[in-house]
Amino acid sequence: IALGIGSVLYANNELKLLTDSLRRVIDEKHVFVKEKEDRINRIKCMLRSPGLTLEGEYRINLRLYNEYKKFHIDSAIHYVDRNIEISRQLNRPYFTNQSSLHLSLLYSMCGRFREAEIILKSIKTSELPRDLLINYYQTYSSFWGHYSISVANNLYGKQQSAYQDSLFALIDHTSWDYRMSQASYYIWRDTLKSKEIFKELLDIEEVGTPNYAMITHSYSRLCHHQKKYDEEKKY
């Protein structure tokens, strides 16, 4: 009985710590938002530079996409759409494929799965250089990950694992992306291994960063798969 009470007290204390941490993040949200908006405005000022070339605009829009994609998806889509136009004007297949992958990822993130998949199916993988091929497999893996959550069907999570197999053959095995993909891959194959990797990533990642949010989001999927709904809610 004492052991059971101790476990409950520990769980309650852990939940309180998480709640307090979340409350602090919410209280400081306006600071983070202000810093983000200031950084975005500085980048936007570069679009007014005299003599700016189309390629220069493309690269500035790319920075704005990266700033906006986890902050304001509609704005990120706006700059990616513009980059697709630029890539066609410049007749640069690399830019076209890069921007198309970015657009597919954004569509997956906001639930526009049909449009996201149409884009992915239109890309000829045989024509992609190594870096874009890695991006392609990452984007397709993310597509199935988001889709499996939306329909609560583990079958689609297994399809995500199939694309991760291809990704593993290309990606740097010492990178954060590799470890993150590995943890997600094992959700459907070895839950203990998956949990071990997620815990390692959480231990070294700073709370509140975009990477931390990605880890907790994916870890919550593992909890859901294991039917540990209280732990899923916590993350």
What function would you assign to each model-found segment?
Residues 1-6:
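Bacterial N-terminal signal peptides
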Residues 7-235:
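A "functional boundary" signal
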